[in-house]
A protein has these predicted regions:
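N-terminal amphipathic alpha-helix/helix-capping segment at the start of soluble metabolic enzymes
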Residues: 1-18, 66-71
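Conserved, mostly hydrophobic/aromatic
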Residues: 14, 117, 173, 225, ...
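Terminal or standalone catalytic/regulatory effector modules within metabolic enzymes
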Residues: 15, 36-54, 292-507
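Active-site beta->alpha loop and helix N-cap motifs at the rims of alpha/beta catalytic domains
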Residues: 33, 43, 48-161, 179-183
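Glycine-rich phosphate-binding active-site loops on the catalytic face of alpha/beta enzymes
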Residues: 117, 177, 224-243
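Catalytic cores of alpha/beta
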Residues: 156-162, 211-227
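C-terminal helical cap(s) of enzyme catalytic domains, especially alpha/beta-barrels
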Residues: 237-262
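Acidic, low-complexity mobile loops and tails
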Residues: 494-541, 548-550, 556
Length: 580
């Protein structure tokens, strides 16, 4: 009897791996019936990740979007699954336990069947509450392994994580090969070991196509006993995204597996609608580089979906690096040469930083340190001269236990800066918070919604939810679309003139610089020219990878100029504020 291979369509991750935004509710409800008609999917990845947050950025209600989008799949008996980041929930930074618990209750009520939970560090302690809360809510708990390739990420290492999450009660295991750098034979051996030790556990494989190995990995894990394979479809398959259903279907069929038939008429309809969504406005936010594959990623292990933001960061520092090289009578570097240097620097520092799996947000942390190291080195400084607070939290153990040891240089640096390593449970650092958010809703006269779903959204994405309720988010999004339309009609915008400063820093003036490539959104309640500020005050917000990051004053002073305006794209190293 042939072994059956089942497919899951990654309709959410197809978009998230391609660009900034997801389809809106009316687009999703238009395409859903045709996905059902394809007749070949047992599962659909519908939400989680950045899905809910993106709806808020539109100025739309994510709860309405999730409920309406899931209805056709629930009615057809197709299982729906979401992605959540354990300690970080469905945002990019840690979430209190009571908010995490409410998330599973809300998502089950909205129609989500399966919670795929991963910890970017593979720390089983972060996964424990995800498994328990999912099961308490009546969901299927699928614990995901963050797959990467290093001397410490062996089959035995991953089996150690599997043993713990099965002990916690996980129903299924996912191999989350987020960068597509898992080696096919090793992944096959891992699945073989899981199936031998836990024959009743469902195994699902998720791989990105960027480096070019994921189809081979799919064949290996299928032969080893995997049950489900995650796939994408045109026009968003391949590139830095995922292998296409049609190719994977053909490979599995040729290998002797039983696979469902594809209704190609429905496939073409879904393909056509997806292209319409791209042509409508979503294509404005798809980085063309994400449509290309490159095996250069294998050495660094960076996920392909980072290429767009990484190239933006490189452009932000390229001129400064060449200026420093020129001042030393050294040859300037091309963009391609700088990319290769960055990849090599990632390879160099990744072991020193304890081999964190290069998945969001830890991939950004390692990439940022590598980039700032390059800036430091060309200016005659040492590596690790600039490490941001989030990266320090990872290095010190506040996000979980690193897979490998830190290099002595980093241990010594932490000691010199008076930083303490943390060995407790990361969740203990984040006390319950729902009561405070519940009071905020009462004070504003906002309903908590069915199953307290509105309360959950405020607690999970507080700033974005407030912007949605005030109407600011909708106005911001419409302006963004208008700007994109204008750019397209006029061609590429002219390069912005350098920002003019009132005075030179040599005359008692200090500047605060951006530490990342981001988009600036002002908050007039926080900062105005003439304000007196103290070191540590919140001055403004930058939006980086769909997350708002606070910009703090690094000194006492008076605001002389705000050097950026609403919606500006800020490069790493750009001046933001002028102080006296």
């Amino acid at each position: 009897m042939k072994k059956k291979i089942r497919f899951s369509l990654l309709y959410r991750d197809m978009w998230q791996s391609s660009g900034k935004y997801q389809p809106r509710a009316e687009q999703l409800t238009a395409v859903a019936p045709h996905i059902v008609e394809m007749g070949c999917f047992d599962r659909i990845e519908t939400n989680g990740g950045a899905f809910e947050q993106v709806q808020l950025l539109y100025g739309e209600n994510p709860n309405t979007a999730v409920r309406e989008w899931l209805k056709p799949f629930n009615s057809a008996g197709i299982q729906t699954h979401m992605l959540e980041r354990s300690l970080n929930g469905i945002r990019m930074y840690p979430v209190p336990a009571d908010v995490r618990k409410l998330m599973f209750k809300v998502k089950k009520a909205q129609g989500v069947d399966i919670a795929r939970s991963f910890c970017g560090l593979n720390d089983h302690r972060n996964l424990e509450l995800s498994v328990k809360y999912a099961r308490e809510a009546g969901m299927i708990s699928q614990a995901a392994l963050s797959i990467t390739h290093s001397p410490v990420h062996t089959v035995d290492y991953f089996m150690g994580v599997v043993d713990r999450v099965v002990e916690y009660g996980a129903d299924e295991i996912c191999l989350k090969d987020m960068a597509g750098v898992g080696r096919p034979a090793s992944l096959g051996e891992l699945v073989r070991r899981i199936k031998k030790k836990y024959p009743g556990i469902i195994v699902q494989y998720h791989g990105h196509s960027g480096p070019g190995m994921s189809v081979a990995s799919m064949l290996e894990v299928a032969r080893a006993g995997a049950d489900y394979l995650d796939v994408a479809m045109e026009p968003l398959s391949w590139g830095m995204v995922h292998p296409d259903l049609i190719a994977v279907h053909a490979v599995m069929q040729d290998a002797g597996f039983e696979v469902p038939e594809i209704n190609m008429d429905a496939y073409m309809k879904v393909r056509s609608l997806t292209q319409e969504f791209i042509d409508d406005f979503l294509g404005y936010f798809i980085d063309p580089r994400n449509r290309q594959m490159t095996s250069l990623l294998i050495g660094s292990g960076l996920p392909g979906g980072m290429m767009g933001s990484m190239m933006a960061d490189l452009k932000g520092v390229h001129q400064g690096i060449n200026a420093a090289l020129k001042a030393k009578n050294k040859p300037e570097m091309t963009e391609d040469e700088l990319v290769v240097w960055l990849f090599r620097e990632v390879e160099h520092i990744w072991p020193m930083m304890g081999y964190p799996p290069l998945v969001t947000p830890f991939s950004q942390y390692v990439k940022n340190v590598a980039l700032m190291n390059i800036v430091s080195l060309v200016n005659g400084k040492e590596r690790f001269a600039m490490i941001d607070p989030n990266t320090w939290d990872m290095l010190l153990g506040r996000a979980g236990k690193l897979p490998g040891p830190l290099a002595p240089e980093l241990v010594e640096l932490a000691a010199r800066e008076g930083k303490e390593f943390y060995e407790g449970n990361p969740q203990d650092n984040y006390p319950d918070a729902l009561d405070g958010y519940r009071k905020e809703m009462e004070d504003n006269g906002w309903p908590v919604g069915p199953d307290e779903e509105e309360l959950f959204e405020l607690a999970m994405h507080d700033r974005q939810y407030r912007d949605y309720k005030s109407g600011v988010a909708k106005k911001r999004f419409l302006k963004e679309i208008d700007d994109k339309h204008a750019e397209q009609s006029k061609g590429a915008p002219a390069k912005a003139a350098p920002r003019k400063l009132l005075n030179s820093p040599d005359h008692g003036i200090a500047l605060l610089y951006s530490g990342a490539t981001a988009t600036f959104w002002p908050d007039e309640e926080l900062l105005n020219v003439g304000d007196e500020v103290k070191k540590g005050d919140i001055l403004m917000y930058l939006m980086i990878d769909k997350r708002y990051r606070e910009v703090l004053a690094d000194r006492d002073g008076t605001v002389r100029q705000i050097l950026v305006k609403s919606g500006d794209r800020i490069s790493k190293g750009d001046p933001l504020i002028e102080f006296s």
